[in-house]
Amino acid sequence: MQVTKQIRGNCQCCGRQQAVKSGTMAKHGYTVERGWFTGVCSGERFAPMQVSREQTDKIITDITAQIPELIAKAEKVKTGKITPQFIIRGRYDSKQEVPFADATLREKSSALTSLEWSFRNRAHAGESFIKTLAEIADEKHNTALVEILK
């Protein structure tokens, strides 16, 4: 059996250690379904974090800007300034969209709570993600790539 070396680095978009091919991250973060790649990480075309953190810093800046916008949207939902267009009534195969104005009070209340918390949860997930990504970048940037034997 022939032993080969693989160079690995951390992806600037997801932070995970993956193979490096020709100076950029190899395709990763995907599944193959019926011969097609689905869910490929957008970091595949960037240099590893050890070499550059330009894309990582851009992601952190973009998400940081989105967080107050998401919280503001949640507040607008809470105060009634934003409402969903539709609510979903029923389950599974019997789902149907109903205009928000035609929904029952209980359905409206549930839809508003759900929408408000979807904005808040997304903001919280963004805060958590950028904290983790920044920690990985601080640890890995300007360090050596990893060589493994396969």
Where do the protein language model's features map onto the residues?
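Non-transmembrane amphipathic alpha-helical segments
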Residues: 56-85, 122, 126, 133
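Extended alpha-helical coiled-coil "stalk/arm" regions
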Residues: 73-108, 129-132, 140-142
